[in-house]
Amino acid sequence: MQEQYRPEEIESKVQLHWDEKRTFEVTEDESKEKYYCLSMLPYPSGRLHMGHVRNYTIGDVIARYQRMLGKNVLQPIGWDAFGLPAEGAAVKNNTAPAPWTYDNIAYMKNQLKMLGFGYDWSRELATCTPEYYRWEQKFFTELYKKGLVYKKTSAVNWCPNDQTVLANEQVIDGCCWRCDTKVERKEIPQWFIKITAYADELLNDLDKLDHWPDTVKTMQRNWIGRSEGVEITFNVNDYDNTLTVYTTRPDTFMGCTYLAVAAGHPLAQKAAENNPELAAFIDECRNTKVAEAEMATMEKKGVDTGFKAVHPLTGEEIPVWAANFVLMEYGTGAVMAVPGHDQRDYEFASKYGLNIKPVILAADGSEPDLSQQALTEKGVLFNSGEFNGLDHEAAFNAIADKLTAMGVGERKVNYRLRDWGVSRQRYWGAPIPMVTLEDGTVMPTPDDQLPVILPEDVVMDGITSPIKADPEWAKTTVNGMPALRETDTFDTFMESSWYYARYTCPEYKEGMLDSEAANYWLPVDIYIGGIEHAIMHLLYFRFFHKLMRDAGMVNSDEPAKQLLCQGMVLADAFYYVGENGERNWVSPVDAIVERDEKGRIVKAKDAAGHELVYTGMSKMSKSKNNGIDPQVMVERYGADTVRLFMMFASPADMTLEWQESGVEGANRFLKRVWKLVYEHTAKGDVAALNVDALTEDQKALRRDVHKTIAKVTDDIGRRQTFNTAIAAIMELMNKLAKAPTDGEQDRALMQEALQAVVRMLNPFTPHICFTLWQELKGEGDIDNAPWPVADEKAMVEDSTLVVVQVNGKVRAKITVPVDATEEQVRERAGQEHLVAKYLDGVTVRKVIYVPGKLLNLVVG
């Protein structure tokens, strides 16, 4: 064994061994308990970033630990390879998205191997290959035949820069999440999957997910947004149709003083024919941002349509306004307004001088003061005719029942959730497998024409999708008739909604999934990824699992038992102000800093001498140029050091602050472990451990070893507090470094302790542990070694600490044998100088003894 720890030598050697032995390749084995550990698959952007490294290190630690418990562990990896960035990069680099993507995959695969992650590479998949997306296309055609897919024209968020549709969640402050361009509204035909048909199940089954973070479940609950209410129909004077609204507060219905419709509503369109002001307003609304977060904060505007609706219960005529806060795609495109008891309606009514009628009493029973704001709390009705005096629930039911009896109301359950629009007007995605015949019939692409292959050898102009620009690509024949293929491609969330299941049978040629393999491995035991995916990917992931279950492919209801959302990785951020007042962000690697005595940064400059402004720690990002390249760190310190720092610096679900001093600390610790093993093995062979022949000191050290095993096992396995597990191993190492190594049993005990330490560290730092295990003559490879088991007998304390009080005041703490009697404890206490001092010349009137804990002598 060499004296110095040289990670660059051992890591590549160990990685080669894993590759040659195919150590982490697994197959279904009914005789073993399975464990499926999955990290969210990466987008092949070109290089790994620290967020990836953190995510995949957590997964690898869990997978290696479960493997050491004797389980059949599947940990696969693949590439979420379709998507918009590839198109931009292709244009910029004068290439096509496919070669750019495949080059990135090759590069990032090497980076993953360099970090020592124990993946089953035989299951690697890339979602941009026809071998993968053909099954997604086939499944889509089957969903269409089941009535779960439809096409409709809908108003969408359109990014003029990316030339694509954005989901509501992808619009941030009215701008595209990716390029910050102002989003427009546009009507285009799109394909939808009926996720709303599964809304109730998606909502109710959240209760089955005991090991998912509450924050994620709450976000999904709110996103699905189930509500119970009443749909009410209004007659409208001089208009051919009725207006239907949905309300969750029918108890306030007697206070409804106006209706509001979306600018795109047929009633508003009709009114605009003779109303130039309204026509201009409708035009303005067409380009209004539509994401709900913006709806809440934007200025509420409207125009009177001139139409009057008739209140079904009072017979009063109430005005109908077109308003920018009502959306056609939400509910019926019309809402009833109760300005006395809804703040948005109140602000709108106040702005335009509309009637405000209070119908709910304040909590103290008085009429509410509506001079400043609406009263939004529930309460007792007044000013409501026959419903006066009813509380919220009674009024809800009474008004709902009356409207139903009159034939103008119906109780309804509504959802905020909208069907999933899966059409994208981009090139680099899976083609949607639908065709339009000459006679206008739309139908699924026949099975014998699947997959519809996306051509990869294309020229990108940065504006039009190559398959839209090439009229020949769309031409095909179905049943002898000329037909045109759909030129839209799938939303890339389609591919990432079922990849976890395909990992169970990546080579399967007969269909989307081999049910036998899928049902052996699924559900995923732990899924690891960022909380930013809570309402998009993680909802579609659950939805797709239910679709596959209903197609008979899987027999579980949910795709993953546990979800672990890792925290973000932060780093210092610095900038200087350029000549034009712009901020130039400088990498923390290039910042020369001065710190105060507490280690805080007080001054910074770069190599060119610019005075830098320090903005604190923020998420590693390209925009702030504060990303740290994992490859540079691995080359400098070794993969094991980077992994250890990642797991030690912070709990897995909290933010992690990147500090190179912390990385250096992790490196020093591994050098200490190496040194201790080197010194131990240099002394030659070791005798067998004889636990009956150990001295008190040796027993105490062995007790520490086994208590550490018990703690680390609990921290990794049950609590998943990996940082405290590492801290416990470090504490034990400090004790081992000071332990005597001269006697035969000292060395035998050290051998047991070091073999335990190396196995406990193995999930975190597998390369060094692989090597040290061989040096310690462990049986076989450490990859197949069992996790150490704590010896209960070794953990039993021989002695205990007893607090000695005189008249309730602590005077001493004494160590006594565990089985000491009260008399022996009193005798031992009397030998303590501080106790004897207070007993001198006084009578002990009473003795209070709590065995093994407390002795209180009451004297007088």
From Swiss-Prot:
Residue span of motif 'HIGH' region: 73-83
Localisation: Cytoplasm
GO molecular function, one term: ATP binding
Key word Protein biosynthesis present: yes
SUPFAM superfamilies registered for this protein in UniProt: Anticodon-binding domain of a subclass of class I aminoacyl-tRNA synthetases (SSF47323), Nucleotidylyl transferase (SSF52374), ValRS/IleRS/LeuRS editing domain (SSF50677)
Xref: InterPro entries: aa-tRNA-synth_I_CS, aa-tRNA-synth_Ia, Leu-tRNA-ligase, Leu_tRNA-synth_edit, M/V/L/I-tRNA-synth_anticd-bd, Methionyl/Leucyl_tRNA_Synth, Rossmann-like_a/b/a_fold, tRNAsynth_Ia_anticodon-bd
Protein family membership: Belongs to the class-I aminoacyl-tRNA synthetase family.
Name assigned to this protein: Leucine--tRNA ligase
